[in-house]
């Protein structure tokens, strides 16, 4: 019996000393379909930050970060909303710095409304991957938070590890960067806002994964994930879901770069759900 106990302890120690490897860049099981690049009809205006696209009869506006230009325009055109597309480089900190001036977002919205010649009746924010850093920074300003009706976080809700690295079992993550998402989720559950969060199974290794942050959010909200197994938009495979009120969290299979990009190309459908 003693040798068995010693073996189990040794096995546990060995596993604790082996960090999980970062996620791969390739995946060959799923099809990973992609939207075809196109230029939908509509008016385009350069703004102080980003490009405004105005399809006909658009009364809602969507600010989207880190998705290029044509893809958000295609999604906006199909959903009949205006979109401001912003591409600013790599890393969530790069996008957060765009809104270090807490008044910048409302100025940008006012500029978009002036060029559109309309006061938008619905304001939505969205980001993919690093772009979620801009959304977080915007919402930290109470005046901007009050003006925003809905937000979409596509596989980009990250934070740091408390000790700077993942734990051997369940990691301890820094809740600081997640506080605004928790506030927004509670408002969505109460019906005051709408929030959609998606995540993959990607493990960055140097900061908390979107799976870990999603687990934290669900736990803090007192919700339970429901295990599902079904096809999602653009060939994604949905594994889990949690929802309450106007809050919705969806977990998708995949821990590779193509799986990450799949969710960006699902923007057309995700924006429809956000409306």
Q: What do these predicted ranges mean?
A:
Residues 56-116, 235-239, 247:
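Active-site machinery of serine-nucleophile hydrolases
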Residues 253, 260-275:
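Catalytic active-site module of serine/aspartate enzymes centered on a nucleophile-bearing elbow/loop
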Residues 127-137:
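Glycine-rich nucleophile elbow surrounding the catalytic serine of serine-hydrolase chemistry
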Residues 137-149:
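Conserved hydrolase catalytic core segment
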Residues 16-61, 235-237, 245, 275:
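A domain-start/cap signature at the N-terminus of enzymes
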Residues 117-129:
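Alpha/beta-hydrolase fold nucleophile elbow
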Residues 1-7:
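Sec-dependent signal peptide recognition
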Residues 152-260:
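The feature captures the conserved acid-bearing segment of alpha/beta-hydrolase catalytic domains
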């Amino acid at each position: 019996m003693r040798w068995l106990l010693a073996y189990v302890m040794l096995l546990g120690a060995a596993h604790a000393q082996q960090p999980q490897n970062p996620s791969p860049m390739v995946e060959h099981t799923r099809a990973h379909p992609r939207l075809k690049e196109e230029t939908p009809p509509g008016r385009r205006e350069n703004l102080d930050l980003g490009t405004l696209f105005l399809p006909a009869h658009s009364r809602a506006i969507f600010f989207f970060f880190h998705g290029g230009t044509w893809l958000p325009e295609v999604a906006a055109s199909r959903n009949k909303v205006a979109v401001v597309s912003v591409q600013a480089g790599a890393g969530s900190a790069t996008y957060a710095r765009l809104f270090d001036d807490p008044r910048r977002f409302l100025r940008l919205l006012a500029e978009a409304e002036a060029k559109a010649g309309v006061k938008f009746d619905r304001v939505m924010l969205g980001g993919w991957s690093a772009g979620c850093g801009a959304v977080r920074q915007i919402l930290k300003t109470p005046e901007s938070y009050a003006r925003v009706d809905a937000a979409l976080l596509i596989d980009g809700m990250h934070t740091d590890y408390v000790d700077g690295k993942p734990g051997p079992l369940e990691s301890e993550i820094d809740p600081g960067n997640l506080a605004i998402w928790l506030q927004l989720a509670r408002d969505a559950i109460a019906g005051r806002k709408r929030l959609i969060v998606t995540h993959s199974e990607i493990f960055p290794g140097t900061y908390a994964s979107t799976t870990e942050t999603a687990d934290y959010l669900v736990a803090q909200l007192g919700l339970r994930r429901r295990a599902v197994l079904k096809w999602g938009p653009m060939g994604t495979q949905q594994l889990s879901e949690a929802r309450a009120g106007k809050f919705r969290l969806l977990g998708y299979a995949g821990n590779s770069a193509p799986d990450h990009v799949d969710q960006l190309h699902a923007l057309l459908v995700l924006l429809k759900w956000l409306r």
